[in-house]
């Protein structure tokens, strides 16, 4: 399912690295990363990964201890533009904040307005541009 989603044009545009599936599947047991399939009414439609900010995210600058990062995509094209992205992101983050996570960060590409709008609807604010191993990104934050 995830492999099929990664091949969808609307996903491949942003998750185009041919090693993405290998990267995602190789991290299944990583203690700092949790991966989820998001469903609505029993229908899987999105992928979400949440990770502890660590040494590989130094480009994000100093962050409060316990800060988590988030990556996601909607795999099913017919679910785009319907508010599902911001809704499941907000619900997921609210649960983490209830468990004591102080801040969430996300780093969309600056030329991905659909993602940026969804993250703003989910409560994220623009914090500035950062350079990442994947290229320039817009750091966005949401505090508990």
What is the role of each PLM region?
Residues 39-41, 141-144:
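Active-site beta-strand termini and strand-to-loop segments that position acidic
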Residues 69-74, 105-107, 139:
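Conserved beta-strand segments that form the floor/walls of ligand-binding pockets within enzyme
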Residues 75, 81-98, 117-121:
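Conserved acetyl-CoA-binding loop-helix of GNAT-fold acetyltransferases
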Residues 96-108:
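Conserved GNAT acetyl-CoA-binding A-motif
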Residues 120-129:
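Conserved acetyl-CoA-binding loop of GNAT-fold acetyltransferases
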Residues 17, 25-79, 95, 99:
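Acetyl-CoA-dependent GNAT
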Residues 1-25:
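A short, well-structured alpha-helix characteristic of acyl/acetyltransferase catalytic modules
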Residues 106-116, 132-136, 142-144:
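Conserved beta-strand-loop-alpha-helix junction that forms the acyl-donor binding cleft
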